[in-house]
């Protein structure tokens, strides 16, 4: 499971979250979160198969409070909303997704919201984590953080794309990846990805968390969650990662 039911506190009054679209005849809907105190660099947040849930709006607001502009493209906009908030409906919608078009939508969102050559961040979860690693291979100015990404690609696509394992050796920018030891994703695949990233041009770090499974970041907003410690530690590292690489203005 990912973050379809994770709790989310109310958005602070000084944080604006608005619905926008990219220009053109086939616009991509996206949410834009920013602070009324002003924002600087851009972080593109890529969700899991449940799409833009309240939990991701909350993460966007938290990053906006740190001074980032945050955009969340809706890569499922061609498929439509899930019939209900459950896992089966999300998986059914996943099976209708053309991953090639999803990547194109992410690229168009980046082109519309990020200045040419500007260093920008991408934060991806599950399916979105796999997409984040793929776009990182195409953008040397991308700073990438992921949670529970699938090294061989998230299963079930109507039209798949090549997996991160086949693209990671071309990643120039810094990468930070988080997984829980109890995640159902094959650990050998993650080890393969770590080896490839270690030989890639950009710096990389793989973080493992004990007693944490898939979607362990839910502990960030749920005090009694079994992975609360892992969630808070990983989030602090993610925030510091973006502050370090986005603040200096260079992904290298």
From Swiss-Prot:
Q: Which reaction does it catalyse?
A: 2-(5-oxo-2,5-dihydrofuran-2-ylidene)acetate + H2O = 4-oxohex-2-enedioate + H(+)
Which cysteine residues pair off into disulfide bonds? none
Keywords, sorted A to Z = Aromatic hydrocarbons catabolism, Hydrolase, Serine esterase
Which InterPro entries has this protein been placed in? Answer: AB_hydrolase_fold, Dienelactn_hydro, Dienelactone_hydrolase-like
Q: What class of enzyme is it?
A: hydrolase
Give any single GO term for biological process: catabolic process
Q: Which residues form the active site?
A: 126, 183, 214
Q: In which pathway does it act?
A: Aromatic compound metabolism; 3-chlorocatechol degradation
User: What is the superkingdom listed in this entry's lineage?
Assistant: Bacteria
Q: What is this protein called?
A: Carboxymethylenebutenolidase
Organism, per UniProt?
Rhodococcus opacus (Nocardia opaca)
């Amino acid at each position: 499971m990912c973050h379809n039911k994770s709790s989310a506190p109310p958005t602070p009054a000084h944080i604006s979250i608005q619905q926008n679209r990219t220009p053109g005849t086939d616009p991509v809907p996206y949410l834009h979160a920013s602070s009324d105190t002003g924002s600087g660099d851009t972080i593109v947040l890529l969700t899991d198969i449940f799409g833009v849930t309240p939990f991701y709006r909350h993460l966007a607001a938290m990053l906006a409070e740190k001074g980032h502009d945050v955009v969340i493209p809706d890569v499922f906009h061609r498929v439509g909303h899930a019939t209900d908030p459950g896992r089966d409906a999300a998986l059914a919608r996943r099976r209708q997704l053309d991953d090639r078009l999803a990547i194109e939508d992410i690229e168009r969102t980046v082109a519309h919201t990020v200045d040419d050559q500007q260093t920008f961040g991408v934060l991806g979860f599950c399916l979105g984590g796999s997409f984040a690693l793929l776009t990182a291979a195409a953008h040397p100015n991308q700073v990438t953080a992921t949670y529970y990404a699938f090294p061989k690609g998230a299963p079930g696509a109507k039209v798949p794309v090549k997996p991160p394992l086949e693209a990671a050796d071309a990643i120039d920018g810094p990468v930070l990846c988080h997984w829980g030891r109890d995640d159902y994703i094959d650990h050998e695949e993650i080890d393969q990805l770590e080896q490839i990233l270690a030989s890639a041009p950009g710096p990389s770090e793989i973080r493992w968390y004990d007693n944490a499974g898939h979607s362990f970041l839910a502990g960030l907003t749920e005090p009694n969650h079994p992975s609360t410690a892992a969630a808070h530690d990983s989030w602090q590292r993610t925030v510091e990662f973006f502050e370090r690489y986005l603040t200096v203005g260079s992904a290298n």
